[in-house]
């Protein structure tokens, strides 16, 4: 079974467009296609109460929780705005994601 096609990839810079962390931006740490979620650095930080196990120390840890994929947009480096993407075919035949507004390529 093939996974879902998502508009963001790991290490992309995204902006949150809805929710309590609206207008915050950060780098995508990981993607969860089955749950339609992305974990963004410094966004949606929650406190987790960790019990001590073995050599690990317990306590209250802060970590990022997933944000739904529909609540993030890719940040264009040239426009410096959240943008939609389109897929274009490059000269060498490879597909790349590009900004709809300015045409800047996100894939290197």
Curated annotation (Swiss-Prot):
Keyword Lipid biosynthesis among record annotations: no
CDD domains: KOW_RPL26
Keywords, comma-separated and alphabetical: Ribonucleoprotein, Ribosomal protein, RNA-binding, rRNA-binding
Domain of life: Bacteria
Transmembrane segments: none
SUPFAM superfamilies tied to this protein: Translation proteins SH3-like domain (SSF50104)
GO MF, one example: rRNA binding
Gene Ontology biological-process entries: translation
A GO-annotated cellular component: ribonucleoprotein complex
Family as reported in the entry's similarity comment: Belongs to the universal ribosomal protein uL24 family.
Quaternary context: Part of the 50S ribosomal subunit.
Primary role: One of two assembly initiator proteins, it binds directly to the 5'-end of the 23S rRNA, where it nucleates assembly of the 50S subunit. One of the proteins that surrounds the polypeptide exit tunnel on the outside of the subunit.
UniProt protein name: Large ribosomal subunit protein uL24
Organism from which the protein derives: Citrifermentans bemidjiense (strain ATCC BAA-1014 / DSM 16622 / JCM 12645 / Bem)
